[in-house]
Amino acid sequence: LGFLFDEGSQQDMTEQSVFIQQGIWARLGLPRELSWGFIGVFLFITGATIEQSWLASMLQSRGFAEVEISLMLSVFGLCVAAVSWFSGIGAGVLGLRRLMWIATLCYFVGSVPFIFVALPMNNYPMMIVSYALRGVAYPLFAYSFLVWINQRCEARILGRAVSWFWIAFGVGMTIVGPWFSGWMLSHVGESNTLLSGFLFVALGAFCALILNRDEPVWARNQKISQAMGEGIMVLVREPKMRLAVVVKTINDIGKFSLVILMPVYLPRFGFSIAEWLTIWGLVNVVNIFANYLFGWLGDKIGWRMTVVWFSGTLCGLASLAVCYAPVMFGHSPAALFIALTLYAVGLGAFGPLSALIPSLLPENKGAAISCLNLGSGLSNFAGPFIVTLCVAPLGVEGTLWVIALLYFAASLLTVPLKLPDNGTKE
């Protein structure tokens, strides 16, 4: 398999060639040269996160307390954050293809003990370790491909290109995964549903790493200590990068909190887990269109302004709507759907961050992308951690208020994230 790890010519990031963006698909932000990569990300994410919408309710039914569940997911999130950060700087050490192959290996190495030993024995310490190892697979795989996109697509379509990435990511994690697992759970049970993820992951790796013949151009001449030191120093030297990490962390806290809170909160109002999974999948169909809409809008009016005006504002209002829709309307799937749809639209408005943040440091995109990915990964930790801290003293309602306030803050924190003078998408 040595040929699969060849990264092509060893050029510096600033000297790389980008695609000549021609044809209707390229103008839509989906260059055909990367099409198999997008398909691979969708399949890999579907398999690697197939349990995320129902794992909390499954563990609760096995007698685990809410605090134990959220702690396990917080540990998982910390590992995801660390690996997400490394996926940006690791390209200069190992190369993008090699990182994605390592991610595939981690998935299988972590999944086997989690499914066959930890879950059947209800072994909590082993569950934490094996689930964390399984969990690092999807950010390492997906965010390495996000680096690939940022490297190979020119600025005028970058907002749309990264929106396609988040569409592939979101369709796998929040639409196909929940719908497919909802059907599988009722027919073959939890363990076999988890095992079905193996097929999706294998197919995803095949599409993104074998059928995808594009060669990322990235210098692999750094030592790991040098690359990690550079990634840390960017956060020390650049205040904008620190702000960007905070905003990107807030981006997905609702998504990773809601999948813990809603399976516990909604049954009080007569909702079943199957209803929750169906509604959650449906509203994320809306997110597909919102992702592309705001990617296009960001390319037109500016990435920063799109995030400032629409992202945190809509997500904050939606968090409050999700809290009070069941209180006001009871067991009303329509009311819950409308509230969650507002959240899905707001989430799409965060999409231009994936074009904005790397462009804040055009001379060091690798380190900037590592900051972007760190924020993405920290969402996995921050969402469950907020639940751990807040749900006992404040309840579900108070926790949703905390999430709403953080979203409102994210819009304000984006205001200073102005591009350098040579930036084109302010």
Describe the function of each predicted region.
Residues 77-85, 174-175, 284-288, 292, ...:
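Residue-level signature of mid-helix packing/kink "hotspots" within the transmembrane helices
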Residues 15-31, 213-245:
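Juxtamembrane intracellular "pre-TM" segments in multi-pass secondary transporters
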Residues 364-393:
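A late C-terminal transmembrane helix in Major Facilitator Superfamily
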